[in-house]
Amino acid sequence: MHGLVGEADSPTSRSKYLARGHAWPRDGDVVRTLTQVAQVIGRPAVLLALDDAGAIAVAEHAAELRPHYLIPDQVPGLPRTLADKRLLAQLCSALGVVQPETRLITGERDAAAAVTDFGLPLVAKWAQPWLLPAGIGLRNTSLVRRANQVPRLLQHVEGRDLLFQRFVPGGPHSDWFFHGYFDENSHCLYGGAGRKERAYPKGAGLTTYGRWLPNPVVEGTARELAAKLGYRGVLDIDFRHDSSRDAYHLLDFNPRLGAQFRLFSDSSGLDLVRAAHLHLSGRRTVRGRAGHGRTYAVENYDLLTAGPRSLRALCSADELAWLSADDPRPFVAMARQAMKRGFTRLARQRA
């Protein structure tokens, strides 16, 4: 396996399964870099995007990449539309997909009106998170609980699309996600629904502890939407159940592989990556028994979310994000990195 890695010392670069890591192009020429990687590999390889920017680049340059890689025949502009949260909101409105009410914020007047109409808390999202510069302390999605949090967001709004969404109150068991792989006819060859048990940050963040469970409504909604869009390839969609309406709001649509894809590993060992590899290389996908009840935990973030309560989950989880008995080095690198960041943060606070 080859991969484009953001940093040479990233935990993923330590995996024994990574034959070679390649640096992201600083000039942004992803096609040239991927072509060079293909020459190193020496034969057609399945290409999977792990972030939105990668998914957009692969879809929009598919004609140039297809001689070197096995990739889904995706509608070229579709991943950009789905990853851009402003365009996604417009698409949901056009298709009648249930979603939280969304406003584009261009300045203080828009922000004040949204706070008045939506109330607090509300959800703030940067429409194109892959364009956010590193090191300025902005999260892709954040929960605005107090009015005095708004000015800091507005400091960075020039040249960027900031969205405010009405907050959908979520109780226990209200957050769900769907991961699936869709063929050239937008038929789901493999997929499943998972329930987000814990997240970081709480209420509007990544899954730190999740469980594979059947949910016909979430599964049906995701499959129906993919069919309407003519979607092909891997996707990851987030939903929140609104008990007041008994409806599932679509919160996010990631046109690429989701971080917790290994949660959905069935009795035969099939998962989303293997399903994609089999299909794109012209082989049949034979599904085993669904692993309903399987759990997945992200060690470092679940500790931040649940503290000591997370230890039981980490000990019993069927799938861990970092630790693997046959490949422990990524976990060790992650732990070192987390401790280094913690000590750095502590030193700054004491300075």
Which residues are covered by each model-predicted region?
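Active-site nucleotide/adenylate-binding loops and adjacent lid/helix of ATP-dependent enzymes
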Residues: 79-163, 168, 172, 184-187, ...
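Phosphate-binding site of ATP-dependent enzymes
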Residues: 144-203, 213-223, 240-243, 248-249
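Conserved metal-phosphate-binding beta-hairpin within the catalytic cores
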Residues: 227-262
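Glycine-rich phosphate/pyrophosphate-binding beta-alpha loops
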Residues: 197-209, 254-269
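Short acidic/His/Gly/Ser-rich catalytic and metal-binding motifs that mark active-site loops
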Residues: 11-13, 131-134, 191, 199-203
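Peripheral (often C-terminal) accessory segments that flank ATP-dependent C-N-forming ligase machineries
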Residues: 275-351
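ATP-binding N-terminal substructure of ATP-dependent carboxylate-amine bond-forming enzymes
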Residues: 1-74, 109-112, 339-351
